[in-house]
Regions:
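Nucleotide phosphate-binding site architecture
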Residues: 2, 42, 156-157
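Amphipathic alpha-helical "lid/sensor" segments that cap RecA-like P-loop NTPase cores
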Residues: 17-62
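Accessory nucleic acid-recognition modules appended to NTPase machines
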Residues: 46-217
């Protein structure tokens, strides 16, 4: 990775910060897609055979070891396939706004069961839920709508198939990759996304940091 970084990312002073550029945006985008698909698994990065059949080598690992064995034994889950359906639904829609009603409809799992499973999946550090705020940075009393991110964007490729340039999921996967860099930060508990209506138009800001003392946004991406 260090060789790629040196070859593809250049930096130069710009006032008190740095300005970044690249000699080849096409190559940089290609490597970013490789990161989305395989970057979370060092064994895949270093082994073309695993990349060629990532679902077989890594997807079954996630399903068999974590979902079908570890979580059921930890939490006494009886209906393993129900948990599997919920997780695969979440993984496919990583980075998108969802609701308990929508999850129940798409996965076929009851809402009260979904609530428990979401807590289990978060405890296993497979997913992270992000709360919604309005255009002033205020949270809602009831979390009817929220976003769920995979903690590792490469899990989606392992469960389904690697994505390519132009795929519909590219935006959500890129968003998942950016959020994943914050998951170990102390700021994580203050990160949200903003969504509100302006007339008939839905507006959204993907990443908003809210000051917990003033309950006001301090920065956004």
């Amino acid at each position: 990775f260090r060789e790629l970084e040196t070859a593809l990312i250049k930096s130069a002073p710009l006032g008190a910060t740095l300005r970044f550029s690249t000699p080849s945006i096409e190559r940089l985008n290609e490597e970013f897609i490789n990161y989305l698909n395989f970057g979370g698994y060092p064994e895949a990065v270093l082994n073309p055979a695993i990349q060629a059949d990532v679902q077989r080598f890594l997807g079954r690992d996630i399903i068999d070891k974590v979902l079908l064995r570890d979580l059921p034994s930890l939490y006494g889950i009886q209906d393993i396939q129900e948990l599997n359906r919920l997780f695969t639904t979440i993984a496919y829609h990583t980075g998108q706004e969802i609701s308990l009603d929508g999850l129940a409809q798409s996965s076929g799992v009851a809402k009260n069961t979904i609530t428990k499973y979401l807590e289990y999946l978060e405890a296993a550090f497979l997913i992270v839920r992000i709360r919604r705020v309005d255009d002033t940075g205020k949270t809602f009393q009831r979390m009817r709508n929220f976003k769920v991110y995979l903690t590792n964007p490469s899990m989606r490729a392992a469960l389904f198939a690697p994505i390519a340039d132009g795929d519909d999921a590219m935006g959500a996967m890129a968003e998942t990759a950016i959020f994943s860099q914050w998951f170990h930060s102390d700021l994580m508990k203050n990160l949200h996304y903003a969504r509100w209506k302006q007339g008939r138009t839905d507006l959204e800001v993907d990443l908003v940091r809210v000051d917990p003392a003033r309950l006001k946004p301090t920065w956004a991406y």
